[in-house]
């Protein structure tokens, strides 16, 4: 359905697939790049910093079968971007990690997700769905004003001396 809409309105579908290994429901993620019927409308992006928890590594990729888009992206990248040599060497090495790395990280994230969801569901009025992938979730909190609540968290609340805030 998304592919049909994108094709009929000449739109792009952008898939950030940096967390594709972190799917908990048992079904593998179907990459947008697999949709052969919309080669000009699909863009897949990935990033080392998200995929491997390599904070600060400013290196990633953009993938598309749209030759015009890729030609323009390459021009921009050649003129504006420069990844540090050390980041390139370290990032290349990260792609040699085996599947056991992602299995261990996936299990840790799943444990954390399950804990957060269980604790949130103990709070009256909180509504949240259990995420099927990645490591973040959206929750509706029983507050009248989200801005005031966030300010209160930053100025008046702590958990054992630690500040608690929204990302």
Regions found by a protein language model. Name each.
Residues 1-167:
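PLP-dependent class I/II
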């Amino acid at each position: 359905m998304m592919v049909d809409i994108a094709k009929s309105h000449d739109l792009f579908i952008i898939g950030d697939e940096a967390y594709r290994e972190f799917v908990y429901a048992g079904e593998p993620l179907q990459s947008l790049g697999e949709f052969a019927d919309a080669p000009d409308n699909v863009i897949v992006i990935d990033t080392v910093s998200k995929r491997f928890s390599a904070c600060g590594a400013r290196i990633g990729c953009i993938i598309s079968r749209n030759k015009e888009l890729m030609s323009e992206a390459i021009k921009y990248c050649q003129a504006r971007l420069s990844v540090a040599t050390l980041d390139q060497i370290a990032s290349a090495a990260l792609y040699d990690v085996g599947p056991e790395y992602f299995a261990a990280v996936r299990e840790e994230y799943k444990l954390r997700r399950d804990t957060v969801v269980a604790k949130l569901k103990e709070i009256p009025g909180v509504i949240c769905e259990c995420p099927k992938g990645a490591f973040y979730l959206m929750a509706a909190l029983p507050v009248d004003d989200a801005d005031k609540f966030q300010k209160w968290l930053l100025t008046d609340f702590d958990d054992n001396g630690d500040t608690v805030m929204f990302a």
